[in-house]
């Protein structure tokens, strides 16, 4: 199944609620005819991660569970691995979607992303990325000349990443 693709801007209400675009919700919300109630219930949450670039990354449970599986391999007895685990989980939250398809972002999450009234939600295949519209515009403008070089370096024509 194709991942999340597209970009939409939405208003964040006074309670910090952000509407997840309907086309993205359709990718992971319950499908009553195909899934059991228990399995569908697990799909009504999103994992929200505060990224280093000032955005918020949203993951559906199945995708986050894959990342979590990797984190479980880290040792609590290795200081660097323990630090990484702490840093990741200190930036992570699990949020339920309400009946209107919104998530309630905490003040901490909103402040991290610099979001006040408007937010841009970008579908980025396995995740969604939430940006302050002005920050996103500035990021894209500042890096406009980098696109071809980055694409050439990291995305090969054969579909394989150039990163080893």
Curated annotation (Swiss-Prot):
PROSITE patterns on file: SPOVT_ABRB (PS51740)
Record flagged with keyword Nucleotide-binding: no
GO BP of this protein: negative regulation of DNA-templated transcription initiation
Gene Ontology CC terms, in alphabetical order: cytoplasm; nucleoid
InterPro entries listed in its UniProt record: MraZ, MraZ_C, MraZ_dom, MraZ_N, MraZ_sf, SpoVT-AbrB_dom, SpoVT-AbrB_sf
A GO MF term: DNA-binding transcription factor activity
Keyword Cytoplasm appears in the UniProt entry: yes
Alphabetical list of CDD domains matching this protein: MraZ_C, MraZ_N
Pfam families on file: MraZ
This protein's UniProt keywords: Cytoplasm, DNA-binding, Repeat, Transcription, Transcription regulation
Domain SpoVT-AbrB: 7-63, 92-135
Subunit structure: Forms oligomers.
Family classification: Belongs to the MraZ family.
Protein name: Transcriptional regulator MraZ
Gene that specifies this protein: mraZ
């Amino acid at each position: 199944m194709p991942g999340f693709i597209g970009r939409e801007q939405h208003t964040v209400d006074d309670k910090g609620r952000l509407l997840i675009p309907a086309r993205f919700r359709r990718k992971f919300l319950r499908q009553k005819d195909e899934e059991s109630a228990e399995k569908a219930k697990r799909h009504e949450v999103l994992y929200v991660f505060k990224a280093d670039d000032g955005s918020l990354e949203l993951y559906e449970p199945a995708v986050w569970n894959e990342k979590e599986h990797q984190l479980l391999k880290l040792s609590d007895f290795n200081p660097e691995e323990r630090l990484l685990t702490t840093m990741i989980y200190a930036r992570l939250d699990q949020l339920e979607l309400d009946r209107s398809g919104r998530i309630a972002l905490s003040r901490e999450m909103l402040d991290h992303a610099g979001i006040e009234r408007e937010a841009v939600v970008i579908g980025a295949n396995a995740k969604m990325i939430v940006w302050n519209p002005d920050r996103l515009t500035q990021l894209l403008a500042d890096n406009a000349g980098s696109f071809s070089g980055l694409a050439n370096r990291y995305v090969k024509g054969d579909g394989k990443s150039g990163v080893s």
